[in-house]
């Protein structure tokens, strides 16, 4: 590892990875096996951020359901997002930080703001270690309605509560930019308040009861981009039903999001030439991809505000790589033929094709973090 890090430092890769201070909070708010797809949605995003090289100590995964180990899961403990079963979303190294009854409105917002009492946090991994320089990805999925997201089929996260928590997190120096992805019915009703300039410029929050207050910032408003899977009055739809399990296994918005993200990691050129993402990684292009897919049956709402100019111009200047990690950037170097100046720690598999080599290079890059 020392040799590998030395090689990367010579090529400027360590500094680039360090600059990409990305963190992720991924929340599935539903319980019960019938909500299998919500757990699967969260695991799809978890898989994506890990493919991009984000280490588990920068990811907080909250799963309200027990679908992986539920007796009704004929494939337990595996989880799949489609009937093809080409990707197990629950590998042995998955790290779930908050489970089932722990996944509450209070805990989810407490992780975002880092205002949880010590007695409730049994492990440091349950905290989001972001700073004022961090870009934070917040993903939410579950059952929702007009200005609310249900938790554990009994409680509700109101849109006003989420907006207040995001504002407080910013003033407590928890992020510099935030990307919110939400997959639920009437999702845009939950994101709308995040772009209310008057609300987001409200005074700083009171001192934390946990005694761990960060210095408050006086910046005007947080820089936020949001993607909502549906408009007010619209439903979000499941992707497909697995006949063996008898339930829907993923939702269309998140399934297509995951497909887009995976394509940004696959090189378009053959081995021996510089690799480039197969699709444009800008958030504006993600919006176009989702809006034009024709498979969602709902309308995508994308917006940016705060220190950023309003969409679509702001989305043009933001990349999914900024929020999901730096591996997609390092792949452009790691994916080139091994040389004395820049080589992975081990040679590629003999006879590897370009996609196979890309997967190998991505696995190599994970060891860096």
Regions found by a protein language model. Give the residues of each.
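Cysteine endopeptidase catalytic domains of the caspase/legumain-like
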Residues: 2-369
């Amino acid at each position: 590892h020392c040799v590998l890090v030395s090689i990367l430092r010579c090529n400027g890769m360590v500094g680039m990875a360090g600059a990409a201070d990305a963190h992720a909070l991924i929340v599935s708010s539903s319980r019960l096996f019938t909500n299998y797809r919500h757990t699967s949605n969260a695991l799809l995003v978890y898989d994506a951020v890990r493919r991009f090289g984000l280490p588990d100590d920068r990811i907080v995964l909250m799963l309200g359901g027990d679908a992986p180990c539920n007796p009704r899961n004929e494939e337990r403990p595996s989880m799949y997002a489609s009937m093809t079963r080409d990707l197990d979303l629950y590998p042995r190294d998955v790290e779930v930080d908050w489970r089932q009854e722990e996944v509450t409105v209070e805990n989810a917002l407490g992780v975002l703001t880092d205002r949880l009492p010590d007695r409730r946090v049994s492990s440091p991994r349950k905290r989001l270690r972001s700073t004022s320089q961090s870009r934070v990805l917040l993903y939410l999925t579950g059952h929702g309605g007009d200005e609310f997201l249900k938790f554990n089929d009994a409680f509700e996260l109101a849109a006003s509560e989420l907006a207040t928590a995001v504002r407080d997190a910013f003033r407590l120096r928890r992020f510099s930019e935030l990307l919110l992805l939400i997959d639920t019915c009437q999702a845009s009703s939950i994101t709308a308040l995040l772009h209310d300039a008057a609300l987001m410029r409200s005074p700083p929050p009171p001192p934390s009861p946990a005694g761990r207050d960060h210095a408050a910032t006086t910046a005007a408003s947080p820089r936020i981009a949001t993607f909502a899977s549906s408009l007010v009055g619209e439903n979000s739809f499941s992707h497909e039903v697995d006949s063996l399990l008898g339930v829907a296994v993923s939702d269309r918005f998140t399934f297509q999001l995951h497909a887009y993200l995976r394509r940004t990691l696959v090189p378009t050129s053959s081995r021996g030439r510089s690799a480039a993402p197969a699709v444009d990684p800008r958030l504006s292009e993600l919006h176009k991809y989702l809006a034009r897919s024709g498979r969602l049956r709902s309308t995508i709402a994308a917006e940016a505000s705060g220190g950023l100019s309003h969409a679509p111009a702001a989305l043009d200047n933001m990349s999914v790589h900024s929020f999901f990690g730096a591996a997609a950037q390092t792949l452009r170097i790691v994916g080139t033929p091994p040389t004395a100046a820049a080589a992975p720690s081990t040679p590629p598999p003999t006879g590897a094709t370009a996609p196979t080599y890309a997967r190998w290079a991505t696995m190599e890059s994970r060891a860096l973090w």
